[in-house]
């Protein structure tokens, strides 16, 4: 079902256990970022847990835990996803929290600066100080020509030192909207009732005009092999990756 404000809702009943999984997918990721602003989407994912006008910083995770649930999030090249696993009876409370932060995010400059230190350390641990992280980053740089496809999801270190809190606020204001999201719910729920609950909680959030996304299919096809070699001081063990460029799934975004 699609609400008047553009939010697409998918509900799948599964009554094998009294639990439910909620996922909200935002159609925004590293492919949408401009050169010099890499890591925007991933940084905003971190800040989405820093509170709203009604839910203080850190309270989101505490409330999910209090309900006996688990939650997390991830950022990819094409999407940013937030998900929770809870007792089915507590699903409405989870949806209320997600609806709130879809349009009421409110973080301070101080929280932003603190979190950027965390993100820079995350990059050091996952990319700078690991051979496989460095290998995959170099593989994308070699395989693609468009900056949007080459960019690191977590962001390049130089960009992580120059991103501003207002960059993230503008990103949030533009892309976190019901008409740029898909809500997926699977579990021990009644589909009709769940759709009604979601419509009540998300239905009044206004839609926002969305700019066209980067056209990934315009990436030129390479008909010759590309080889890249890199060294890393953290290991003497050789790592090898063989990657193949394959055709896209036609209109996958439209299908979703």
Give the ranges of each region predicted by the language model:
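Non-catalytic beta-strand/loop surface segments
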Residues: 1-30, 54-90, 126-180, 204-251
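Short pre-active-site segment immediately N-terminal to the catalytic Zn-binding motif
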Residues: 29-38
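Active-site SXXK
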Residues: 38-52
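Hydrophobic face of alpha-helices
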Residues: 41, 57, 61, 95, ...
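Bacterial peptidoglycan biogenesis and beta-lactam-recognition machinery
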Residues: 49-53, 103, 107-108, 190-192, ...
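M16/insulysin-pitrilysin zinc metalloprotease superfamily fold
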Residues: 51-54, 85-116, 251-254
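Non-catalytic accessory/assembly modules
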Residues: 110-117, 124, 130-138, 185, ...
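Non-catalytic, conformational "gating/processing" segments within enzyme and secreted inhibitor domains
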Residues: 116, 165-201
């Amino acid at each position: 079902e699609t609400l008047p404000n553009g939010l697409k809702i998918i509900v799948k009943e599964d009554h094998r256990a009294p639990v439910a999984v909620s996922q909200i997918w935002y159609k925004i990721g590293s492919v949408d970022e401009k050169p010099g602003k890499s890591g925007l989407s991933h940084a905003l994912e971190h800040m989405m847990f820093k509170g709203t006008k009604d839910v203080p910083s850190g309270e989101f995770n505490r409330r999910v835990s209090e309900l006996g649930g688990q939650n997390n999030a991830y950022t990819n090249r094409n999407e940013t996803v937030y998900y929770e696993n809870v007792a089915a009876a507590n699903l409405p409370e989870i949806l209320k929290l997600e609806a709130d932060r879809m349009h009421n995010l409110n973080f301070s400059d101080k929280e932003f600066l603190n979190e950027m230190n965390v993100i820079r350390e995350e990059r050091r641990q996952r990319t700078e100080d690991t051979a496989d992280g460095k290998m995959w980053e170099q593989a994308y740089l070699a395989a693609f020509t468009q900056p949007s496809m080459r960019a690191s999801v977590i962001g390049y270190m130089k960009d992580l030192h120059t991103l501003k809190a207002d960059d993230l606020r503008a990103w949030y204001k533009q892309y976190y909207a019901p008409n740029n999201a898909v809500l997926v719910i699977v579990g021990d729920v009644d589909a009709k009732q769940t759709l009604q609950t979601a419509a009540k909680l998300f239905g009044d959030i206004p839609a926002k005009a969305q700019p066209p996304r980067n056209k990934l299919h315009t990436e030129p096809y390479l008909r010759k092999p590309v080889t890249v070699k890199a060294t890393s001081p953290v290991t003497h063990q050789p790592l090898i990756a063989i990657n193949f460029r394959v055709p896209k799934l036609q209109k996958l975004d439209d299908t979703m």
